[in-house]
């Protein structure tokens, strides 16, 4: 494209910028990850994080997330969020709960309460926090805090889709609460080009542990 006329300089600059945006967007790929369990069946509630090897990607907190307590269970059982995201632990049961976590990623305690706590809990460090109830031992939930904007939680078919992944080399971390104790997840290398990418991951895990009946 040639632009000589001074009167068209602004229009040409705008068009060049727009084309640059389009070209930049076209270089971002969609990464699809299929997660299966030890038996080869689709594994829901698996967490996938992509971390760039060459650069620290900017990440922002999410809007307030709710983890509810109903029928003496946490819902959702696995929650994926980014660093700095506040979480409200709403109690919809007719009994009071005592919600806590002693995990290094986030230690907190919400003593016996009903309804909605006065303040949310801000998860300000990356990692996995196991949440329980000091009154009802069968209750358990997992809060996974990501320090990357490239993340996803597998659906009922074990599928994760991560959009806008720039070309480059990444560390892919896959985790599930059904992994053996003391397992920190599975880490592998992933190279992303300009084309969309599909990856399959099998974990030595079964479905997420279900809360036992009270």
Where on the chain are the PLM-derived regions?
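Bacterial N-terminal signal peptides
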Residues: 13-24
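Extracytoplasmic copper-binding redox domains, predominantly the cupredoxin/blue-copper superfamily
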Residues: 28-159, 163-214
């Amino acid at each position: 494209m040639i632009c000589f006329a001074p009167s068209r300089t602004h229009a040409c600059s705008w068009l060049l910028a727009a084309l640059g945006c389009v070209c930049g967007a076209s270089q971002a790929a969609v990464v699809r990850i299929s997660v299966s369990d030890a038996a080869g069946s689709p594994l829901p509630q698996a967490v996938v994080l992509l971390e760039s090897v060459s650069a620290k990607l900017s990440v922002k907190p999410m809007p307030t997330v709710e983890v509810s307590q109903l029928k003496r269970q946490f819902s959702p059982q696995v929650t994926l969020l980014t660093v700095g995201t506040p979480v409200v632990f709403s109690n919809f049961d007719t009994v009071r709960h005592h919600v806590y976590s002693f995990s290094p990623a986030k230690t907190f305690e919400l003593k016996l309460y009903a309804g909605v706590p006065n303040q949310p809990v801000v998860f300000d460090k990356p990692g996995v926090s196991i949440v329980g109830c000091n009154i009802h031992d069968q209750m358990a939930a997992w809060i996974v805090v990501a320090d990357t904007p490239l993340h996803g939680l597998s659906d009922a078919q074990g599928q994760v889709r991560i959009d806008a992944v720039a070309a480059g080399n990444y560390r892919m971390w896959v985790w599930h609460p059904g992994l053996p104790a003391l397992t920190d997840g599975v880490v592998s290398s992933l190279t992303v080009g300009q084309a969309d990418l599909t990856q399959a991951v099998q974990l030595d895990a079964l479905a997420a542990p279900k809360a036992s009946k009270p």
